[in-house]
Amino acid sequence: MAKYDEKKQLKCSFCGKTQDQVKRLIAGPGVYICDECIDLCSEIIADEFEETVEFDTKSVPKPNEIKQYLDSYVIGQERAKKSLSVAVYNHYKRINTNKQDTDVELSKSNILLLGPTGSGKTLLAQTLAKVLNVPFAIADATTLTEAGYVGEDVENILLKLIQNADYDVERAERGIIYIDEIDKIARKSENPSITRDVSGEGVQQALLKILEGTVASVPPQGGRKHPHQEFIQINTSNILFICGGAFDGVDKIIENRTRKSSMGFGAEIQGKHEKDIGKLLKEIMPGDLLKFGLIPEFVGRLPILVTLESLDKDALINILTKPKNALVKQYKKLFELDDVELEFNNEALTSIAEEAIERKTGARGLRAIIEEMMTEIMYEIPSDEQITKVIITEECIKDKENPQVERLPEGKTRGTLASNRVKKDIESA
């Protein structure tokens, strides 16, 4: 019940203070609560919530466990998976250590992934977030521009993470952000220019603070900031940033450097194409990234360099068939939902892999190749009840021939077979 003094003045039902003694008194059905009691309740709830979201190092998977999980989804790239597993484990171990009173404060180590298109950079980052059960966001560096110009502010990257954490800022502050196409924001030339580079060096400068760790003000609805809107405050000190890019042309920079260092009497002479790009990338140094167009401060905030190799034919065939979410398994499941069996023969898988290599799209292009070839048969199956099996052959890929089809005799359909199976199951039960 609402409490009244002799002058019928309203009082807080919890602390007993009158409306004159507090800034605000909020009414409910038969009760009142003051702003001071609301603040106290908020503090109690916040303290309890903080205990529930406390990130315990013991719960972080060990590097070998992280790699085993990555192996289930990512084929090949053994060296990259080991490097990422160690880096991610150390990052979350650092979060806990810095909460304790220690003499040494561990600094953050963000990651730079370098590898050809379709080598698995994005998939690696996504899978890491999945195994750690932390919020994850992907951003495209090519959409970012310096503040004040048409395009996205860098703070919009953080908004995506907050949204994926269901606006739970505490969880978002322990999340992972993957910035793709980071090589596209390299400045246009090695020498500083007097003209404004709003999508290159300007974006690198804008990213520096959030990469290192700062309390950023994020507009909750996205878009540009304006002075009359409220902001979400988020501390980026414990957010792990993984930046990825193909860095086309950096192999020539590495090759020039290594060739100069191996010049001289008795030096081993190698042909220009003797080393593939994947092997050259393993020899990358921070100085090569500076020559490519990244500024020194930006390179300094990405101390862990992880390189990925181009995927060969065998790796692409394994990607088609072995992971938990392999494309062949996905399409077989789609056909199974229509009571149709799908089969890829070995020659067909080889042809799909060869086509992806020819298109230079890596693993990313595998789905497009299969989809092009399967569209017609997937269009026909739902309305053709006599088809029971579809076989994909080498000719389907190379010569664009239709898949081989097995059909039921006239008068029989998949629907009648399914109903007969149900009847038998009922009778046997």
From Swiss-Prot:
GO biological process terms on file: cell division; proteolysis involved in protein catabolic process
Keyword presence, Zinc: yes
What keywords is this UniProt entry annotated with? ATP-binding, Chaperone, Metal-binding, Nucleotide-binding, Zinc
Q: Where does ATP bind?
A: P116, T117, G118, S119, G120, K121, T122, L123
| Binding site residues for Zn(2+) | C12, C15, C34, C37
- Superkingdom of the source species: Bacteria
Please provide, in alphabetical order, the Gene Ontology terms of the cellular component aspect for this entry. Answer: HslUV protease complex
Q: Which InterPro entries match?
A: AAA+_ATPase, ATP-dep_Clp_protease_ClpX, ATPase_AAA_core, Clp_ATPase_C, Clp_protease_ATP-bd_su_ClpX, ClpX_bact, P-loop_NTPase, Znf_CppX_C4
Which HAMAP family is this protein grouped with?
A: ClpX (MF_00175)
What function does this protein fulfil?
Answer: ATP-dependent specificity component of the Clp protease. It directs the protease to specific substrates. Can perform chaperone functions in the absence of ClpP.
Q: Which PANTHER family match?
A: ATP-DEPENDENT CLP PROTEASE ATP-BINDING SUBUNIT CLPX-LIKE, MITOCHONDRIAL (PTHR48102:SF7), ATP-DEPENDENT CLP PROTEASE ATP-BINDING SUBUNIT CLPX-LIKE, MITOCHONDRIAL-RELATED (PTHR48102)
Family label = Belongs to the ClpX chaperone family.
User: Mind telling me what this protein is named?
Assistant: ATP-dependent Clp protease ATP-binding subunit ClpX
